[in-house]
């Protein structure tokens, strides 16, 4: 069946800028709805490609696409990713000086940007509202849309500014909302508070089959952590701690054991946080030890494990953080190390939280009740003898088998081997040297461009190159993630490295 013209154009742009020949999951459904002028809500797991759903329409629609995003680091990473894909974008947040902010607005008026990321707090300022009323806005995309819900794990009152902002625009744009973690109650809140009009709703499922979940209750957490990390010494991983103090202790523990680690929490100077994040993204350190301040917007595909050294406050936070493992589709492990003190720490944070307290004592009491209910669900996860994957999916309202056969609890019961899909095999020994060469070339490009290596080519793309050894442009363009733009910018150099390696091996043989 012949594709309709807008979707055909969308697919061409997907290939040109991102190097993929077809859409995944609900991407096509949501993009088609947005292009037809329909509001949309996408509930898609981490790594499912939510940003594609508004970036591709953003390139096709006549006006500007505004993306409402909650964190400065998230916006900056997204704009860097656009740049790597050959797309001009900008962000408007408090990291800009007033002069830089005015210049960005002026450039936007001149049509230099198709996609602009903006903080929700910015929507209520008169200067930004005047700007928004003076330019054509075709689409407003809301990232991390669960932040609008008081039932969510990360309620942000500033997200309540979005619907009034859209209502004051001269012409109502298409409104699209996206999140990775939303229970049925949170979905209803998103629909209500954002005032989505007859939206296309796509819930693609929360199941990440490549993730292996396990809960341990060790008598010695430090020893358990060291044993686990030692087993994954050559792999990238994240260790989440509930407090800054624990981040410091765990970082010191790992370093004293000869493991390269960086730390990240809100109490550090911005420069140290940035240096640590960069070192992790560039694979200069293997382990990032962090509070929940780290992770949102960090587009690192090859994280092989996530360890929670402390139990999080709720399932939403746990699954979002655990979901930062295995974004390249390869097998990855999500380990939670439970201790009785974790509950007391979580209770302390809930009792002392100020989020959502603007409504007075009654609102505070209601918010705390919600948070304590969520904490109970989190504790139940740690103590269930049933399937961990089923527990997670059931929490988010998704049907699943009572046993997945491939989590810590199921394996303990059934003693079966993992049967996880592995779309791209990791390089065998014969390809390992070529793979390491390609990683070195990628790092050179990344450092010169000031981009994380994964934005040049993902590990999966490099693995595919090492396995298939493309010998010409046509072969290179068959590699997932090699777009025409990226081939011109980087691919020719990678091709020469592969060809030289092949010639050298032929000479030896």
Enumerate the language-model features and the residues they cover.
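Intrinsically disordered, low-complexity N-terminal extensions of nucleic-acid-metabolism proteins
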Residues: 1-2, 116, 504-509
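Helicase motor core with emphasis on the C-terminal RecA-like subdomain
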Residues: 3-4, 8-17, 21-25, 29-51, ...
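C-terminal accessory region of SF2 helicases/translocases
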Residues: 285, 302-307, 311-320, 325-450
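Long, highly charged low-complexity segments enriched in Glu/Asp and Lys/Arg with interspersed Ser/Thr
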Residues: 407-418, 492-505
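C-terminal extensions
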Residues: 445-449, 463, 502-509
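Helix-hairpin-helix
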Residues: 448-460, 465-494
């Amino acid at each position: 069946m012949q594709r309709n013209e807008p979707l055909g154009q969308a697919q061409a742009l997907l290939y040109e800028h991102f190097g993929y020949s077809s859409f995944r999951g609900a991407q096509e459904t949501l993009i088609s709805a947005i292009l037809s002028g329909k509001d949309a809500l996408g509930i898609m797991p981490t790594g499912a490609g939510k940003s594609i759903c508004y970036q591709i329409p953003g390139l096709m629609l006549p006006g500007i696409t505004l993306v409402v995003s909650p964190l400065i680091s998230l916006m900056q990473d997204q704009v860097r990713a656009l740049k790597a894909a050959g797309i001009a974008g900008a962000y408007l947040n408090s990291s800009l000086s007033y002069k830089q902010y005015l210049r960005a607005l002026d450039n936007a008026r001149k049509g230099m940007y198709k996609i602009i990321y903006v903080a929700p707090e910015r929507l209520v300022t008169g200067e930004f509202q005047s700007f928004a009323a003076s330019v054509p806005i075709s689409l407003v995309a809301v990232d991390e849309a669960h932040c609008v819900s008081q039932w969510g794990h990360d309620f942000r009152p500033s997200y309540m500014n979005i619907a009034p902002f859209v209502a004051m625009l001269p012409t109502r744009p298409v409104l699209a909302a996206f999140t990775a973690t939303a229970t049925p109650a949170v979905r209803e809140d998103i629909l209500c508070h954002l005032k989505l009009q007859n939206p296309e709703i796509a819930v693609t499922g929360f199941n990440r089959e490549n993730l292996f979940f396990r809960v341990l209750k060790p008598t010695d957490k430090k020893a358990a952590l060291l044993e686990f990390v030692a087993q994954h010494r050559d792999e990238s991983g994240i260790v989440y701690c509930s407090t800054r103090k624990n981040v410091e202790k765990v970082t010191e523990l790992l370093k004293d054991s000869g493991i390269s680690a960086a730390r990240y929490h809100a109490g550090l100077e911005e420069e140290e946080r940035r240096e640590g994040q960069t070192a992790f993204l560039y694979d200069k350190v293997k382990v990032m030890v962090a509070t929940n301040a780290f992770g949102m917007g960090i587009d690192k595909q090859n994280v092989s494990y996530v360890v929670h050294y402390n139990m999080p406050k709720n399932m939403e936070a746990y699954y979002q953080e655990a979901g930062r493992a295995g974004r390249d589709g390869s097998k990855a492990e999500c380990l939670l190390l439970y201790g009785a003190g974790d509950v007391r720490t979580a209770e302390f944070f809930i009792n002392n939280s100020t989020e959502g307290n603007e409504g007075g004592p009654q609102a505070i009491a209601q918010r705390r009740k919600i948070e304590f209910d969520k904490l109970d669900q989190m504790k139940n996860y740690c103590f269930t003898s049933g399937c961990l994957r089923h527990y997670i999916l059931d929490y988010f309202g998704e049907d699943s088998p009572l046993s997945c056969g491939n989590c810590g609890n199921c394996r303990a019961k059934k003693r079966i081997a993992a049967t996880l899909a592995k779309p791209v095999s990791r390089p065998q020994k014969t390809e390992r040297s070529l793979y390491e060469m390609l990683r070195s070339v990628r790092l050179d490009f990344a450092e010169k461009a000031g981009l994380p290596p994964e934005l040049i080519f993902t590990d999966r793309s490099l693995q595919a190159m090492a396995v298939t050894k493309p010998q010409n442009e046509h072969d290179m363009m068959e590699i997932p993630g090699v777009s025409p733009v990226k081939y011109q910018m980087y691919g020719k150099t990678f091709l020469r490295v592969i060809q030289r390696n092949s010639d050298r091996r032929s000479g030896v043989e």
